Regions:
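Long, compositionally biased intrinsically disordered regions
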Residues: 1-232
Length: 232
């Protein structure tokens, strides 16, 4: 499962995305230090309202004079990943007197996966029965209710697997580098290129293995087979 694309709702994917946002920033002429990134992420995980500029300024202990590198939306407004699924889950669990910090990274990753790959209550309950993480009926009902009212947050898959993100995250804390730079330096991108560089044709099975929608997968396979036929 760690080799598959991760659920965007997994804890690891949320931390990875926020770290990538932070590493893209240059503030007052410098990059964020490791300890600053850790404190910022802790604040994002525990705040009820999140103002990223304010959190960053408070952690840096500086007034922000220059701020570059943030992603922007169509209205030119800065946007950041804010661990939205984690925070909604934290608040929902708190209502039934459960502390989200009782769950490990692996627990939260598995919960995120189950709530993403399944869409109906029966399937989710069955998945929880077979999961490594053991939950009470009250917690299961809480999580399923959260998923029902926030379906869009549990409908996406990340570009990377849990395995790759877990390898990158320690480096992303230590170095002010974004994901693609680190992937190239660590040889992950090169490894993917080497994997197929001797292929004369598109390896259909390998190329579509991360596509989960069966209709889309079939369309992609047909397209690749046509391209391969044209290259013969």
């Amino acid at each position: 499962k760690e080799e598959l694309r991760a659920a965007s709702a997994s804890y690891t994917a949320q931390e990875f995305n926020l770290l990538n946002d932070l590493n893209n920033l240059t503030i007052n002429g410098r990059k964020l230090e490791e300890h600053e990134k850790r404190i910022i992420i802790d604040k994002v995980k525990t705040s009820n309202t999140i103002n990223m500029r304010k959190i960053i300024a408070d952690v840096m202990g500086e007034k922000i004079e220059e701020f570059y590198g943030a992603r922007i939306d169509k209205s030119e407004k800065e946007i950041f990943h804010k661990m939205e699924v984690y925070n909604k889950m934290r608040k929902a669990l708190a209502e039934i007197h459960v502390n989200i910090e009782e769950f490990s990274r692996e627990n939260l990753d598995e919960i995120g996966y189950i709530l993403t790959i399944n869409t109906d209550k029966e399937a989710m309950m069955e998945a929880f029965e077979h999961a490594n993480v053991k939950l009470s009926e009250e917690i299961k009902d809480c999580l399923i209710s959260l998923r029902k009212t926030n379906g869009a947050l549990f409908s996406k898959w990340h570009s990377f697997s849990l395995k790759i993100m877990k390898e990158l995250i320690p480096e992303m804390y230590q170095q002010p580098k974004e994901q693609m730079t680190l992937l190239t330096e660590m040889g992950v991108m090169r490894g993917q290129m080497d994997k197929f560089e001797k292929n004369k044709y598109i390896p259909v099975d390998a190329a579509d293995e991360d596509i989960f929608n069966p209709v889309v997968r079939r369309a992609v396979r047909i397209s690749f087979k046509i391209l391969n036929a044209l290259m013969k």
